[in-house]
Amino acid sequence: IFFIGFISFLVLSRTIADLQARERQETTQTIPNSNTPKKTTTASSSSKKEEDINPELVGRPIIDISGWQLPSEIDYDVLSQNVGGVIVRVHSGAQAKKENAATYLNGLDKSFKTHIQEFQKRNIPVAVYAYVAAKDKKEMEKEAEEFYKAASPYKPTYYWLDVEEKTMKDMNAGVEAFRAKLQALGAKNIGLYIGTYFMEEHSISTDKFTALWIPTYGFDDGYYNAAPDTNTEYDLHQYTSQGQLNGFSHYLDLNQIAPTQDQEAIYRKLFKVQKDNSSS
């Protein structure tokens, strides 16, 4: 009996050992070795596409500035944290009769280079604008050339024409001469800044511009009060000249993408940073 019991014990022990060995083998096959490269899912071509805008900037205020906002009074590090884009004045138009604190006698803004460079190196997209004030078509074309020559090396995301006053009999023809010359020089993204009343009074056509920027202030108390009173589709709304943002101790013009528009789509349209010369 003892012998039979001993044999049974050996057989049972062998069976248990075999089962434990099999379990270890299965476990080894199930759990990857730490030295074995992990399998990764390859991203689709669409998800691999490099983001052409910073989504964090989309909801922030957009400012427009000139030489009247002195670089020495701006903390670019702080202000850059509070804006989604900047539109910098490059040319002040032919109305400059003498040099002043913000403008050279030739019409070029004294601070445009500094403004553009300081915001761009902080990854804030920059567009540019010129105040349109020539007295005839020939002068309009000359201003367009000066504007493009000064701005294009910085590859701005957009070129804007700021039209606020009547400086020639047919302002629509003058504005078109400026726009057409700018386009002929190589600018592809060209927008128009204009008040709705002036646009209607002087029959300024927006058809050939690729974006429209309209000022409507309401109470002009630093906050959004009212949308532009127009049936014309617009992209950007300048809603106050009394805005205040950390990084600059004086008032700023504040702008927002039209509330009726797709915010990200319009932001991408106006502030997509070009990696080639497609905007310039």
Language-model features, listed with the residues they occupy:
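Substrate-binding cleft of extracellular glycoside hydrolase catalytic domains
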Residues: D52-R179, Q183-L185
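Conserved beta-strand termini and adjacent loop/short-helix elements that scaffold enzyme active sites
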Residues: Y131, Y193-G195, Y239
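Positions that flank functional sites
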Residues: G93, A134, Y197-F198, Q244
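Extended hydrophobic/Leu-rich segments
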Residues: L12, I16-L19, Y267-F271
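Hydrophobic membrane-insertion alpha-helices, especially the h-region
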Residues: I1-R14
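Catalytic domains of cell-wall/extracellular-matrix polysaccharide-remodeling enzymes
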Residues: Y158-A227
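N-terminal, intrinsically disordered, polar/charged segments of Gram-positive cell-envelope systems
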Residues: I16-G59
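Functionally critical loop-and-helix segments that line ligand-binding/catalytic clefts
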Residues: A43, S47-Y76, T210-S280
